[in-house]
Amino acid sequence: MSVVGFDVGNENCVIAVAKQRGIDVLLNDESNRENPAMVSFGEKQRFMGAAAAASATMHPKSTISQLKRLIGRKFREPDVQNDLRLFPFETSEDSDGGIQIRLRYMGEIQSFSPVQILGMLLSHLKQIAEKSLKTPVSDCVIGIPSYFTNSQRLAYLDAAAIAGLRPLRLMHDSTATALGYGIYKTDLVANSSPTYIVFIDIGHCDTQVCVASFESGSMRVRSHAFDRNLGGRDFDEVLFNHFALEFKEKYNIDVYTNTKACVRLRASCEKVKKVLSANAEAQLNIECLMEEKDVRSFIKREEFEQLSAGLLERLIVPCQKALADSGLSLDQIHSVELVGSGSRIPAISKMLSSLFKRELGRTVNASECVARGCALQCAMLSPVFRVRDYEVQDSYPFAIGFSSDKGPINTPSNELLFPKGQIFPSVKVLTLHRENTFQLEAFYANHNELSPDIPTQISSFMIGPFHISHGEAARVKVRVQLNLHGIVTIDSATLIEYHKENITSEEMISEENHQSSAMKDGSLDPSSGSIGNEPKAIKRMEIPVVANVSGALTKDELSEAKQRENSLVEQDLKMESTKDKKNALESFVYEMRDKMLNTYRNTATESERECIARNLQETEEWLYEDGDDESENAYIEKLNDVKKLIDPIENRFKDGEERVQASKDLLKTIADNRMAAESLPPPRKNAVLDECHKAERWLHEKTTEQESLPKDANPELQSAEIRRKADALNATCKYIGKSNSPPAKPEHNGSYGSRKSDDMELD
């Protein structure tokens, strides 16, 4: 069993695997370490990764990318609408307010949710891992942005289930980076006090910042901060808008009106950005951008930095917020690490160096650090790996509260159940006085931390039904968990009834102020007094809990999505097999045409050559016309038809070559047996020599007969016949050589024609 870490980025994906000697990043079929996060739909087949990226320019409306911007989101969210205006593919709103991606596939318009598309991408990454490792892949850790909401995290788990993966954890990107950094940095724990490191991850579509502390054998994330809408693609968009305006004035073309032109210009702008990261200036040249017009332009790094000034200023905000939430001063920070695909712009490094008053570190691989950290975490969680003890404490970036039909539920100190910065996984136990079915709701306590129009409600839980015999002497204990994935769940609800006379009014939980006690698992209810005075329970009963979780697929929906994915995989495999058979037929036609003109020319008659040449030409024309899009069986039948004509000629040629070698082998067998016969008694020696002479004479006669025939005639002497003769000679000579008595001479017994031989004894 393998343990794998997946970094599913907005632009690219990276796969890392934990091995005994360390962490390795896997290569795809193109020998690249990064896999484009794209899924493209052809007429009858899907294409993933690099194959999808290759078709993005030609088929933009059927190529899906930037899934992280859509997963677990609602169609009408402002951020989603801003993104959809940039995407070339068609979308619509489903019945639940979610997003549906519409495209043409298998001759009809089909709809897919972002969860289904992500499931396809994860399935592709899983296939790459299994092909490289030559073993099934199931257990994994998947990196996610720290700002993902509960519904987005659930969507990732659903997508992983569709792909046949079992995530042991959804891990924050920056936490994974910190783990991969800290577990190898033994110098960080030289001092007795913690070492504080800031990690800034500027990705394709977002910026994440975290402050982590490192001690001997452990790390803790003290704060997370982020800008959901600031990444490398925004700097690309600055260049795109600049050149689009310039081309409108210079060439009188409006690229905004042409989908393919937009895709091509954005791809070129990304290349220009990379050139400007290492050079002071860059050129842009695109042939036939639109209206058959070639465009060219030029930009300097200084101009690009001026155009990006607003974006650079926005980078300061999450950095300052992360530092403030950590409660640390700038002087306490040991170092600052900069990672992410968008971190290579010189102006970004310069601005952040000025902010933190130090040079930025780049000691981790900017593109692979998340995947490597996820693989490490997977190894720690998997039972099949032994990893040295290293504790990872992550913090949750949102404050989560609970409420019931009687009002908000807080801790005895009047705090939220899971305040912002809560270390998770975390379990709290609520002790409530209820007499019948009730409902709990989980919600984000601060809507300002969320994107606009994202609902604050997370999920609701119906607890019950249940029946109690002593109403005033019963309590319901609810076990609430913020689990390893950062998802809010209720593990269990238990009804506990006590002896009525053992319960005083002070021992009951007062809910007049709409509060209940909340404590960590295993601690005492503050209202219950000491352990010795705790009333004795007379009845415990598990209460059913029904969750209504926003953003999660139901069991039926998940099962249907899995079945649909399986059918799509079967179709892909069918098309790949059909493509292989078509390529095999095409290769066979070209190969045989060449051999008929050269290798097989002398072994075929004139009429055979003409017939085969005509058939090969007809097959080639069929391939490029009527047979361009045929079934797998059609290609197999065509190949068999051509082979029926070729096989006799091919057999003549091959048998002619093999006949020469078989003759040499028979002559060697004859020589070997003659040499072995020298050590035998005279009668057996003569018998062996006689058999060798017969075989030699047979070969000479047959060879002479064969050589008298033309090369294009069917052979009279076949190589298989010669090999059988050699085997028979060996067997006969071996039989004679092992006999205990010599062969008997013929004797006259009665009449002249009557002969009798002695029986031979075998060893």
From Swiss-Prot:
It comes from the Eukaryota. CDD domains: ASKHA_NBD_HSP70_AtHsp70-14-like. InterPro entries: ATPase_NBD (IPR043129), HSP70_C_sf (IPR029048), HSP70_peptide-bd_sf (IPR029047), Hsp_70_fam (IPR013126). The keyword Phosphoprotein applies. GO terms for molecular function: ATP binding; ATP-dependent protein folding chaperone. Residues 509-529, 701-763 are annotated as: Disordered. Keywords: ATP-binding, Chaperone, Nucleotide-binding, Phosphoprotein, Stress response. The modification Phosphoserine is found at S528. Transmembrane segments: none annotated. Residues 701-714 have a biased composition (Basic and acidic residues). It holds the Pfam family HSP70. Disulfide bonds: none annotated. PANTHER family: HEAT SHOCK 70 KDA PROTEIN 16, HSC70CB, ISOFORM G-RELATED. Belongs to the heat shock protein 70 (TC 1.A.33) family. HSP110/SSE subfamily. This is Heat shock 70 kDa protein 16. The gene is HSP70-16.
